[in-house]
């Protein structure tokens, strides 16, 4: 059911209500609930249920009428929202008001009986008092709920049979576009590697074992003038991160990237950068740019994408590389479990080939991950090399994602990820936070986030105390997205 008023019309109704008094039920004077009912009646012709204001979100069926939001640290109210304060207001009955303005720091409302002057004559029916609808600013609080009405559309929908309807035309859906790669050819100068005498026969895809800061540009800065002694430790043809490709060697040159004569002489090595330090989303983007560059090169050389032209480092020597790609796309971690089995190797190669073929055909593929991996969040199964440990014994890693609480309140801590630290507040069911850090400490997995300048630490599941990557975790107390 859509409201009888548009949002703009209801805002005007709220503005005209300032200075007036409302007693919608005819009892106990001009209560805050009466003013909420007056607005609800203007919108839907209905009255709300509940003994006190705090009952409104739970005693009413808002299906089709409104959406109920529970306050979270980064929730932003909107004009026209009904805001419900919990039982710590109104002598246990709560409080309710209508939002007219809002920022992330405060709300400005129209409200009645905030000062308790809505019923002062002692007469139960109808009752009277001096307090009128007033405009006032409040801080967000916990718990607090916001009820957002389904306002009438600003422009009423027209019947499909109306003669004023324009003829429908087929509109082409916008097609996704490939990232425009920034290819920087700046061949290493410290040593002139030998020529192979022909185009490469295949591409070897690597994971670089680099930190978050190990971007293509960082490799360029560190290797372009490196001496022979450094290049002998390994040099691939290209390094890829974001939309940047640093071409370190000419296509005609032999590379030193597989520790194998055939791989070095006939293969073109490409490093997917930041494989040890980047979050999954960043690494998957680096992969996609790598696939796009592979497609460009294969087309240039007149080669198809198949199992002969797309190779893995671990085909030429005993190595876990490409380790991060293996975890994401096969669910098998060669760093902790040993060499990648042949069936997993073929699974990974075929994924690479499918992605590259799509780029060769002018399509934009979608990155997919194995159900056995934890690509949506390292919180579930962290990559051991991404963890660090501080002087307090806390294991921690960078990660950016959203945690949404399940059906039980969680005590949030300040100062640090310890159960003995000061209590921040109660993180309510359905609330969410956008965190930037994951920690293992004091028998729990914690996420860290900042709200209004304060750093908070929220436990989201249990931890058995074992150091990563051998930790055993309990069930997640909500969802990660």
Curated annotation (Swiss-Prot):
Temperature-dependence annotation: Optimum temperature is 37 degrees Celsius.
Binding positions for Zn(2+) per the UniProt entry: 206, 313, 321
Single GO term (MF): metal ion binding
Residues annotated as domain Peptidase C51: 7-148
Binding site for Ca(2+): 34
SMART domains: Ami_2, SH3b
Cofactor: how bound: Zn(2+) is required for amidase activity.
Start-end of Polar residues biased regions: 155-166
PROSITE patterns per the UniProt record, alphabetical: CHAP (PS50911), SH3B (PS51781)
Top EC class for this record: hydrolase
Required cofactor(s): Zn(2+)
Positions of region (Disordered): 155-177
EC number of the protein: 3.4.22.-, 3.5.1.28
Matches recorded under InterPro entries: Amidase/PGRP_sf, Amidase_domain, CHAP_dom, Papain-like_cys_pep_sf, SH3-like_bac-type
Keywords: Antimicrobial, Bacteriolytic enzyme, Calcium, Cell wall biogenesis/degradation, Cytolysis, Host cell lysis by virus, Hydrolase, Metal-binding, Multifunctional enzyme, Protease, Viral release from host cell, Zinc
Catalytic machinery residues: 32 (for endopeptidase activity), 95 (for endopeptidase activity), 111 (for endopeptidase activity)
UniProt remark on domains: Contains a cysteine-histidine dependent amido-hydrolase/peptidase domain (peptidase C51/CHAP domain) at the N-terminus, a central amidase domain and a SH3b cell wall-binding domain at the C-terminus. The CHAP domain is present at the N-terminus and is associated with the endopeptidase activity. The SH3b domain increases the CHAP domain activity.
Protein's recorded name: Endolysin LysH5
């Amino acid at each position: 059911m859509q409201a009888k008023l548009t949002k703009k019309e209801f805002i005007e109704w709220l503005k005209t209500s300032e200075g007036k008094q409302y007693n919608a039920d005819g009892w106990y004077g001009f209560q805050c609930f009466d003013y909420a009912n007056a607005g609800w009646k203007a919108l839907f012709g209905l009255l709300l249920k509940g003994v006190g204001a705090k009952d409104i979100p739970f005693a009413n069926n808002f299906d089709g009428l409104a959406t109920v939001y529970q306050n979270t640290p980064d929730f932003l109210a909107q004009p026209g929202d009904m805001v419900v304060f919990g039982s710590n207001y109104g002598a246990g009955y709560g409080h309710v008001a209508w939002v007219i303005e809002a920022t992330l720091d405060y709300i400005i409302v129209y409200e009645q009986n905030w000062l308790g002057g809505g019923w002062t004559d002692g007469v139960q029916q109808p009752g009277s008092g001096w307090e009128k609808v007033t405009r006032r600013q409040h801080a967000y609080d916990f718990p607090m709920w916001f009820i957002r009405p389904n306002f009438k559309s600003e422009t009423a929908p027209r019947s499909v049979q109306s003669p004023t309807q324009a003829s429908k035309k087929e509109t082409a859906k916008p097609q996704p576009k490939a990232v425009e790669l920034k290819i920087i050819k700046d061949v290493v100068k410290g040593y002139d590697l030998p020529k192979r005498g022909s185009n490469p026969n295949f591409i070897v895809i690597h994971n670089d074992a680099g930190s978050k800061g190990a971007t293509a540009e960082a490799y360029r800065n560190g290797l372009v003038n490196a001496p022979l002694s450094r290049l002998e430790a390994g040099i691939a043809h290209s390094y890829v991160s974001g939309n940047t490709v640093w071409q370190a060697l000419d296509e005609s040159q032999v590379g030193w990237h597989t520790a194998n004569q055939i791989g070095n002489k006939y293969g073109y090595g490409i490093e997917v950068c930041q494989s040890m330090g980047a979050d999954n989303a960043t690494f998957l983007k680096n992969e996609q740019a790598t696939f796009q560059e592979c497609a460009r090169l294969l087309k240039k050389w007149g080669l198809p994408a198949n199992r002969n032209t797309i190779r893995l480092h671990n085909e030429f020597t005993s190595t876990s590389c490409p380790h991060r790609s293996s975890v994401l796309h096969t669910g098998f971690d060669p760093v902790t479990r040993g060499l990648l089995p042949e069936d997993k190797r073929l699974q990974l190669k075929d994924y690479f080939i499918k992605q590259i073929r799509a780029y060769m055909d002018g399509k934009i593929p979608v990155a997919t991950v194995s159900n056995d991996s934890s690509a949506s969040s390292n919180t579930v199964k962290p990559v051991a090399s991404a963890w660090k440990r501080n002087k307090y014994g806390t294991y921690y890693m960078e990660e950016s994602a959203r945690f949404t609480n399940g059906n039980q309140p969680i005590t949030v801590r300040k100062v640090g990820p310890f159960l003995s630290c000061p209590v921040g507040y109660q993180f309510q069911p359905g609330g969410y936070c956008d965190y930037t850090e994951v920690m293992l400490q004091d028998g729990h997995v914690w996420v860290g986030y900042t709200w209004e300048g304060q750093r908070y630490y929220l436990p989201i599941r249990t931890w058995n105390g074992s150091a990563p990557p051998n930790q055993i975790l309990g069930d997640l107390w909500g969802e990660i997205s």
